[in-house]
Amino acid sequence: MAQVIITINYREYPISCDNGQEIQIMKLGRLLDEKAKSLTSALGHINENQLLAMVGLLLADELSELKKTVSSAP
């Protein structure tokens, strides 16, 4: 089992993952960090739990829209 540190909005989180998954976890962490920083730029300071919930909602919305697009494609 491997461990990587991801940073989201200047806070570090240790994440355990399968060996070989480290690069993917770091990429996903950077995506979360970008979303979090974008939200804090737009909204100002919000508490960490709220921020992470909002990031999750944004990503869930993007995924939902992609699924709609894929399911309606010929």
Language model regions located:
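Short small-residue beta-strand/loop micro-motif enriched in glycine and branched aliphatics
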Residues: 14-16, 37, 66-67
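Short amphipathic alpha-helical segments and their helix-coil junctions
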Residues: 29-42
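N-terminal intrinsically disordered, cationic/polar leader segments
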Residues: 3-5, 74
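An acidic intrinsically disordered interaction segment
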Residues: 11-31
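Long, hydrophobic or amphipathic alpha-helical segments
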Residues: 45, 49-52, 56-74
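Amphipathic, hydrophobic secondary-structure cores in small proteins
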Residues: 5, 12-14, 42-50
